[in-house]
């Protein structure tokens, strides 16, 4: 430290400076190059002091000279006397004994001359000095006072120095150099102990050395002795100590000579008295640690001593000026207490251009001025001298840093002053930039947060922005334009609670015009009143805050709106789910109670009305999803194209088609009920089947709904199979005729037992012939069938369908599967004719029905009856098909025909969805419902519902049935031979399909792939179904529909999880039945049962019946293949539509 501390070494490299150079070094290293220019060096500081002599209170010229030489020694600008003294005393002593001599001299000076102590203290920048400075609360004046006190108390030499200034000056010059060295050491120690005193000496390290004379020379030597060990750190410590002792003696002698001591005496005495104890303790520390700095300080002090420019006045004025170099560095960091040794790496950041870094005795505003707040009393020179005394303004922790005129930014950097400094006036440019940034940020936030931002920005943003831009007009704009903004905000919410309003209110207060805002006058208007500039700033702040509040309010409003929207969406979803659940529950209840709930769902009714409006277009539209899926049916394609748009209204579909299908008095109601049940399970029984199907339908899609209506029709038809028969509603007529009306049921028994499976086949082909319907028959049909007789549940239910279907079918006239087949052909034909009559538009259904019949002709004894039902159901809609499957088991032909009529669109659209959803809905309702309605009613209900809504769907369903037959052809061919005209063969296939039923999911995929497999499955199942005559209906439905859809479930889970899922659900079987009906009616009913089934499902199955009959017997294989292809396409389309709808419908 001694070497770096030597004044000659003061211009040391940053490394040396980092080593903890004395204040002189700190000043000199930066100062020697730059401070020489800036007067940073001690010599320059002294020169500055000389210039400052008037500033400092008129330091004697000798003092100024001393300061100049001391300061100039470092920058090599020392006067001749200073050079001489520095050369012989300082240079020799400094280089050799700087550390020890300075420590000793500082101790002596502390004893001898407080001036020297004070001056030296600021000059010796010790790394510890900052801490000392922090410790010192003294302002430069205080330091001077302390020096004066110390001088008075410690030495009368100060007075003597005042007496003999001229004579003592010469001696003092020499001694002051030594004293400065000592002071540097003392200041280092004092800075450690008393940062205040050293800070008072900030002007020059020599001045800082003045602190050394805190104690009498006796005390100083004592301290020097302990300091000597510290000085001993340097090899020259002993010599320095000796020289320091000599210098102390000289200084004792010279102190009376020091004229500046008079000025310094009062301050220095006070400083010395204060610093006496501190310096004693710190002298040892500083001597040990800051010997080098002390040497520099001593040199500086000696330089100052020559002229004895170290006046308390100088110190006062010099309260550490801000380091010009640091400020040049332009980077004021708040690293504060970072060690100086980091400075090299952080020179750019911490030291700016000042290489001294933390050690610099001048204030580095953010770095080394911490703790100087109290020390520097914000002397007027500092704050006023923003640039020159800026360093002093910082009141850097190092009192050694003399108040340099260069440290202009001191005010900002003074930690205590910073508040005044922080509010530096913002240039218009800066303000504009800031405002633009704020506006941009706010606008961005608003855009993001406020839903109505586009609307609001015109009204709100302008007011806010104008305020900031035109501050002159603040009052008026705040009163006027901003008021508008506020009012707008107020409309949104209570911004007044926010501080912005208060600020604005304050601004208005100042303006004298305030809006009556709640919080306006409360917050902080008063502080702003005094200073309008400040008020403007606060106003700006308040405005910004208010704007932020407005933004927050807007954001909140946007969020609330979004939340409300989300809530509404969730509510809609919940309502859909609830409707679906209601439909399911109602279907279940209806199944259990056997009473159709026509208006269970309120929304479904509304939606039904809407759907009726849209369904008329949508039944085709509903079909279109399937239509596209089933390119074979161009009508379906057309309707499918519409459906994508109408997908949104899953409920609408079933509504309008059902009303159409339900020309009968009850069908409109049933349709509506079915629509609600489709959308929300309107029918009590049918509504329950429908409800489940509708729950799937509603959640699944409009097809789902159609399906659910169809299923609801099944439950409803179980209540009012009469409805389905006379209603001519496709699903209803089937369902009602078989279930409600004994004769339709009789027809349906034939049709159902036969058509149950044929519809299953009819639906099955679209669905997966064997796969889905059998499970449906087993699962859904058991449920559906159970209402007439539970035996119709899995496997057996097909026969119970004949038998159990007989309960529904027996309702008409209980017919054995065989009779059903015979009857089914007529009934199917009649039903198909009726369907054609009612659903002539659904030619597809007719084709579908015939195809279904033909494809299931083998197992189509039921398949025929069911085939008409299925053709109606199928042409009605795949959904109807899938729903019909379950309802088909009970109301095979009527249900399938109604289902095909109504489900033409919905079934096509929901073919997959419906088969899973509808069959699930019909199934789950059927399970409960079977007991009530034996399932035919239910199945019929769904089928009829499907048939009814399908009236619009019928064209599609007929097309689909045509397609289905093409999809079923192989199945129908295989099924037809086996159960084509034989109710039992048909029943056996359903027997098999019940197992296959289980996999309803296979509705679509299986349909494509499994229609052939379904044929084989049907063949397998047909035998098994044949084995089970009662089950055949169900199995038929399971099997033939499986060919289309039902098989999906049993053997074709791949068909579609939808089928499977309905499979899990009771309604599934109904779609299976509907599906079976369609395929079966074409295969089995094309021969004779097709007509019977058609007649049984007369309203829905007329077209299907004829189609089934024609396509079933004669062109079954060929038509079945072409229709199978069509059905496969339709199934694909339906699956796609279902997938789309599921994606769209959250509930599903």
From Swiss-Prot:
Protein name according to UniProt: Zinc finger CCCH domain-containing protein 18
Residue positions where Phosphoserine is found in the record: 666, 1056
Biased composition (Gly residues): 388-397
UniProt KW Protease keyword: no
Entry keywords, A to Z: Coiled coil, Nucleus, Phosphoprotein
Region feature Disordered, mapped onto this chain: 1-315, 380-417, 521-1127
InterPro entries, alphabetized: Zinc_finger_CCCH-type (IPR052647)
GO cellular component labels: nucleus
Taxonomic superkingdom: Eukaryota
Coiled coil: 543-584, 1118-1146
Broad class of where this protein is predominantly found: nucleus
Annotated gene: zc3h18
UniProt-annotated location(s): Nucleus
Compositional bias ranges of the Low complexity kind: 1-13, 677-740, 847-875, 882-903, 914-925, 1083-1098, 1107-1119
Residue ranges, compositional bias (Basic and acidic residues): 53-73, 82-96, 190-202, 261-289, 530-615, 632-646, 818-833, 933-964, 1012-1029
Comp. bias regions, Acidic residues: 144-156, 167-176, 203-214, 233-245, 290-306
Organism: Danio rerio (Zebrafish)
Pro residues bias: start-end ranges: 622-631, 783-800, 807-817
């Amino acid at each position: 430290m001694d070497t770096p501390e030597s004044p000659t070494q003061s211009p040391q490299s940053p490394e040396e400076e980092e080593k903890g150079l004395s204040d002189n070094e700190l000043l000199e290293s930066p100062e020697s190059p730059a401070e020489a220019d800036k007067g940073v060096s001690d010599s320059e500081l002294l020169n500055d002091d000389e210039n400052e002599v008037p500033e400092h209170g008129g330091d004697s010229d000798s003092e100024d000279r001393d300061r100049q030489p001391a300061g100039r020694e470092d920058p090599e600008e020392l006067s001749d006397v200073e050079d001489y003294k520095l050369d012989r005393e300082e240079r020799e002593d400094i280089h050799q004994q700087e550390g020890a001599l300075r420590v000793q001299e500082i101790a002596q000076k502390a004893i001898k001359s407080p001036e020297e102590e004070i001056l030296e203290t600021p000059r010796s920048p010790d790394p510890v000095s900052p801490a000392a400075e922090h410790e010192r609360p003294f302002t430069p004046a205080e330091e001077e006072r302390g020096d004066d006190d110390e001088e008075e108390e410690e030495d009368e030499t100060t007075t003597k120095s005042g007496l003999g200034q001229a004579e003592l000056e010469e001696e003092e010059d020499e001694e002051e150099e030594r004293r400065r060295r000592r002071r540097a050491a003392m200041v280092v120690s004092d800075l450690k102990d008393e940062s205040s005193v050293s800070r008072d000496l900030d002007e020059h390290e020599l001045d800082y050395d003045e602190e050394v004379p805190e104690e009498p020379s006796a005390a100083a030597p004592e301290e020097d002795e302990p300091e000597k060990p510290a000085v001993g750190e340097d090899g020259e410590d002993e010599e320095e100590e000796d020289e320091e002792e000599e210098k102390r003696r000289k200084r004792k002698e010279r102190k009376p000579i020091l004229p500046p001591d008079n000025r310094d005496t009062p301050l220095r005495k006070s400083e010395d008295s204060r610093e006496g104890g501190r310096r004693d303790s710190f002298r040892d520390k500083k001597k040990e640690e800051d010997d080098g700095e002390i040497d520099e300080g001593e040199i500086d002090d000696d330089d100052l001593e020559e002229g004895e420019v170290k006046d308390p006045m100088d110190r006062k004025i010099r309260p550490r000026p801000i380091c010009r170099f640091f400020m040049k560095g332009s980077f004021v960091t708040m690293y504060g207490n970072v060690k100086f040794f980091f400075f090299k790496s952080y020179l750019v950041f911490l030291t700016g251009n000042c290489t001294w870094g933390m050690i610099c005795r001048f204030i580095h505003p953010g770095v080394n001025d911490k703790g100087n707040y109290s020390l520097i009393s914000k002397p007027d020179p500092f704050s006023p001298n923003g640039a020159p005394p800026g360093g002093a303004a910082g009141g850097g922790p190092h009192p050694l840093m003399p108040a340099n005129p260069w440290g202009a930014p001191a005010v900002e950097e003074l930690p205590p002053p910073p508040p005044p400094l922080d509010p530096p006036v913002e240039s218009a440019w800066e303000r504009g930039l800031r405002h633009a940034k704020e506006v941009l940020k706010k606008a961005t936030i608003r855009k993001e947060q406020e839903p109505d931002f586009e609307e609001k920005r015109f009204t709100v943003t302008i007011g806010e922005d104008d305020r900031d831009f035109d501050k002159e007009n603040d009052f008026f704009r705040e009163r006027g334009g901003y008021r508008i903004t506020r009012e707008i905000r107020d409309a949104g919410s209570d911004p007044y609670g926010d501080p912005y309003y208060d600020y604005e209110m304050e601004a208005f207060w100042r303006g004298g015009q305030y809006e009556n805002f709640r919080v306006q006058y409360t917050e902080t208007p008063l502080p702003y009143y005094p200073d309008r500039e400040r008020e403007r700033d606060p106003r700006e702040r308040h405005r910004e805050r208010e704007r932020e509040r407005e933004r927050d309010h807007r954001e909140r409003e946007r969020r609330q709106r979004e939340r409300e929207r989300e809530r509404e969406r969730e509510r809609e979803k919940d309502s859909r789910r609830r409707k679906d659940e209601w439909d399911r529950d109602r279907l279940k209840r209806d199944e259990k109670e056997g009473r159709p709930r026509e208006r269970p769902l309120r929304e479904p009714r509304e939606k039904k009305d809407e759907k009726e409006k849209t369904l008329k277009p949508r039944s085709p539209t509903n079909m279109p999803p399937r239509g596209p899926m089933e390119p074979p049916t161009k009508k379906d394609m057309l309707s499918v194209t519409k459906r994508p748009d109408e997908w949104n209204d899953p409920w609408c579909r079933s509504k309008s088609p059902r009303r159409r299908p339900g020309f009968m008095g009850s069908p409109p109601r049933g349709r509506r009920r079915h629509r609600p049940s489709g959308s929300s399970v309107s029918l009590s029984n049918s509504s329950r089947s429908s409800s489940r199907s509708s729950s799937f339908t509603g959640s699944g899609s409009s097809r789902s709904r159609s399906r659910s209506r169809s299923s609801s029709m099944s439950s409803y038809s179980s209540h009012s199979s009469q409805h389905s028969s006379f209603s001519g509603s496709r699903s209803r007529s089937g369902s009602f005729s078989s279930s409600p009306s004994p004769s339709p049921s009789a027809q349906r028994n034939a049709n159902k037992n036969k058509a149950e499976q044929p519809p299953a086949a009819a639906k099955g082909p679209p669905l997966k012939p064997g796969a889905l319907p059998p499970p449906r028959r087993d699962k859904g049909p058991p449920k559906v069938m159970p209402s007439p007789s539970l035996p119709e549940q899995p496997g057996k239910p097909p026969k119970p369908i004949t038998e159990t279907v007989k309960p529904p079918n027996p309702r008409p006239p209980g017919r054995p599967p065989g009779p059903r087949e015979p009857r089914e052909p007529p009934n199917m034909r009649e039903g198909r004719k009726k369907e054609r009559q009612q659903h002539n538009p659904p030619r597809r259904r007719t084709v579908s029905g015939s195809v279904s019949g033909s494809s299931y002709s083998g197992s189509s004894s039921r398949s025929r009856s069911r085939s008409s039902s299925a053709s109606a159901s199928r042409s009605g809609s795949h959904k109807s098909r899938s729903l019909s499957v379950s309802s088909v088991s009970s109301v095979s032909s009527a249900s399938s025909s109604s289902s095909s009529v109504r489900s033409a669109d919905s079934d096509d659209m929901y073919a997959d969805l419906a088969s899973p959803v509808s069959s699930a809905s019909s199934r789950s309702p059927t399970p409960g419902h079977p007991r009530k309605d034996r399932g035919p009613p239910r199945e019929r209900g769904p089928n009829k519902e499907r048939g009814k809504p399908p009236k619009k769907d019928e064209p599609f369903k007929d097309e689909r049935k045509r397609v289905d037959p093409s999809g079923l052809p192989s199945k129908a061919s295989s099924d037809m031979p086996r159960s084509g005209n034989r109710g039992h063969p048909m029943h056996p296939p359903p027997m098999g399909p019940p197992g296959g039923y289980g996999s309803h999911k296979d509705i679509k995929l299986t349909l494509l792939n499994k229609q052939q497999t379904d044929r084989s499955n049907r063949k397998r199942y047909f035998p098994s179904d044949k084995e089970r005559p009662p089950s055949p209906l169900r199995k038929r439905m399971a099997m033939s529909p499986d060919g289309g859809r039902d098989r999906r479930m049993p053997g074709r889970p791949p068909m579609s999880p939808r089928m499977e899922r309905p499979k899990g659900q009771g309604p599934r079987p109904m779609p299976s039945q509907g599906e079976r009906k369609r395929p079966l009616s074409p295969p089995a009913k094309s021969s004779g049962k097709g007509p019977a089934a058609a007649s049984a499902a007369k309203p829905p199955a007329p077209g299907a019946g004829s189609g089934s009959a024609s396509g079933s017997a004669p062109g079954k294989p060929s038509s079945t293949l072409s229709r199978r292809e069509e059905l496969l396409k339709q199934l694909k389309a339906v699956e796609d539509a279902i997938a789309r709808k599921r994606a769209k419908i959250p509930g599903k």
